[in-house]
Amino acid sequence: MMLYIVFILSVIFVIGFVGFSSKPSPIYGGLGLIVSGGVGCGIVLNFGGSFLGLMVFLIYLGGMMVVFGYTTAMATEQYPEIWLLNKAVLGAFITALLMEFFMVYYVLKDKEVEIVFEFNGLGDWVIYDTGDSGFFSEEAMGIAALYSYGTWLVIVTGWSLFIGVVVIMEITRGN
């Protein structure tokens, strides 16, 4: 049952990003991105990352809703265009969905999924418990590893978010 839930959430995740990439109006692009982010948090929660899923949901989606609410208010249209009105956008949306479904069928037709990534060199990330001496929370150790070993990742992520907000502000201010 859990496999089906993750599969359905993954399909909704991809459909949301296909909808985001073939948006006819900025309102629907933001909606597709927010839906995909929420479904992605659900996938993380399903795999046991309750803290990470909650933080992404609160911080990322909260920030996304503020940014997209502001940009939508700046670039609003009286009658926003939908997918059905523009035949080129509808064709791109349906083509992308068909390509995604054929890719899933091609991968799953043998009912075997091979390991795509091999995790070598996890010695720094493994939590060592000496038995009866105590309990280590995996989420707390993951956060500690993110800020100790992933310092540059946090810096690059913060800088990317800042540049994204600056670009969005420049685009909306130009109209």
Swiss-Prot record:
<keyword id="KW-0999">Mitochondrion inner membrane</keyword>
<keyword id="KW-1133">Transmembrane helix</keyword>
<keyword id="KW-0813">Transport</keyword>
<keyword id="KW-0830">Ubiquinone</keyword>
<comment type="subunit">
    <text>Core subunit of respiratory chain NADH dehydrogenase (Complex I) which is composed of 45 different subunits.</text>
</comment>
<dbReference type="InterPro" id="IPR001457">
    <property type="entry name" value="NADH_UbQ/plastoQ_OxRdtase_su6"/>
</dbReference>
<keyword id="KW-0496">Mitochondrion</keyword>
<keyword id="KW-0472">Membrane</keyword>
<keyword id="KW-0679">Respiratory chain</keyword>
<feature type="transmembrane region" description="Helical">
    <location>
        <begin position="88"/>
        <end position="108"/>
    </location>
</feature>
<feature type="transmembrane region" description="Helical">
    <location>
        <begin position="25"/>
        <end position="45"/>
    </location>
</feature>
<dbReference type="GO" id="GO:0005743">
    <property type="term" value="C:mitochondrial inner membrane"/>
</dbReference>
<keyword id="KW-0812">Transmembrane</keyword>
<keyword id="KW-0520">NAD</keyword>
<feature type="transmembrane region" description="Helical">
    <location>
        <begin position="149"/>
        <end position="169"/>
    </location>
</feature>
<keyword id="KW-0249">Electron transport</keyword>
<dbReference type="GO" id="GO:0006120">
    <property type="term" value="P:mitochondrial electron transport, NADH to ubiquinone"/>
</dbReference>
<dbReference type="InterPro" id="IPR042106">
    <property type="entry name" value="Nuo/plastoQ_OxRdtase_6_NuoJ"/>
</dbReference>
<keyword id="KW-1278">Translocase</keyword>
<dbReference type="GO" id="GO:0032981">
    <property type="term" value="P:mitochondrial respiratory chain complex I assembly"/>
</dbReference>
<dbReference type="InterPro" id="IPR050269">
    <property type="entry name" value="ComplexI_Subunit6"/>
</dbReference>
<protein>
    <recommendedName>
        <fullName>NADH-ubiquinone oxidoreductase chain 6</fullName>
        <ecNumber>7.1.1.2</ecNumber>
    </recommendedName>
</protein>
<dbReference type="Pfam" id="PF00499">
    <property type="entry name" value="Oxidored_q3"/>
</dbReference>
<comment type="function">
    <text>Core subunit of the mitochondrial membrane respiratory chain NADH dehydrogenase (Complex I) which catalyzes electron transfer from NADH through the respiratory chain, using ubiquinone as an electron acceptor. Essential for the catalytic activity and assembly of complex I.</text>
</comment>
<dbReference type="GO" id="GO:0008137">
    <property type="term" value="F:NADH dehydrogenase (ubiquinone) activity"/>
</dbReference>
<feature type="transmembrane region" description="Helical">
    <location>
        <begin position="1"/>
        <end position="21"/>
    </location>
</feature>
<comment type="similarity">
    <text>Belongs to the complex I subunit 6 family.</text>
</comment>
<feature type="transmembrane region" description="Helical">
    <location>
        <begin position="47"/>
        <end position="67"/>
    </location>
</feature>
